[in-house]
Regions:
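Conserved N-terminal segment of class I S-adenosyl-L-methionine
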Residues: 1-82, 86-88, 99-106, 111, ...
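A generic structural signal for short
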Residues: 93, 133-134
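Short glycine/proline- and charge-enriched loop/turn segments
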Residues: 126-132
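Short "lid" loop at the C-terminus of a central beta-strand within the Rossmann-like core
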Residues: 37, 120-126, 139
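Conserved beta-strand signature within the Rossmann-like core of class I S-adenosyl-L-methionine
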Residues: 112-122
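Hydrophobic adenine-recognition pocket in adenosine-nucleotide-binding enzymes
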Residues: 92-95, 120-121
């Protein structure tokens, strides 16, 4: 399922969509991969949280810092034995090569019941030769994701999420009624 929403994005819209995708998570665990400062994930209400980033980040919610793990996400996931309820990667996979991005998504599907990713739409500020972790190394579209994970994910495409480029959510959630979900998203964004 792919739904296009022609709205300019904001943190509030991001949070509304995430809350709708996740539902009640008061008894659920989450791993936030390539978390950056994780401004929104703490607001979703997960009972158990793990934040992983390769750089020593200070999280926006200071009380969450105790759950931060300084690690390469691949090292962390390859050594992990836990299955999380949710694995989230917001503005992360574009910082990896395509090959590593597909590898990350695959690890997420193996180590969580539900996966949610959010990334810029297409190639934006991409420098494939860069080595710094904050640089975009790939650009993604639903077609690229579907090429590797045919029919696995649902999509919300927002071509005007940012002022100069779009973004999209893609997710798989076992307990989500896709028909009602689209109606809920549209209702929540009005």
């Amino acid at each position: 399922m792919t739904k296009t929403i022609d709205k300019i994005g904001s943190g509030e819209i991001y949070l509304q969509i995430m809350k709708t995708i996740c539902g009640d998570v008061s008894d659920k665990s989450v791993i936030d991969l390539m978390c950056y400062h994780s401004p929104y994930i703490p607001q979703l209400g997960f009972s158990e949280r793990t934040y992983v980033d390769i750089q020593d980040r200070k999280l926006d919610h200071k009380e969450e810092q105790q759950f931060f793990v300084l690690s390469d996400v691949f090292d962390f996931l390859n050594g992990n034995r836990k299955v999380f309820d949710f694995a989230i990667c917001t503005d992360g996979i574009e910082h990896l090569s395509f090959k590593r991005g597909i590898e990350l998504i695959t690890l997420m599907t193996e180590q969580s019941q539900s996966q949610i990713l959010f990334t810029p739409l297409g190639e934006n500020m991409v420098n494939k030769k860069a080595t710094h972790p904050d640089i975009h190394k790939s650009g993604w579209t639903p077609d690229i994701i579907d090429k590797h994970f045919k029919g696995y994910f649902s999509y919300i495409v927002m071509p005007n999420f940012h002022t100069t480029f779009g973004a999209f959510f893609f997710w798989r959630h076992n307990n989500l009624d896709k028909t009602n979900f689209v109606n809920d998203i549209l209702k929540n964004l009005q």
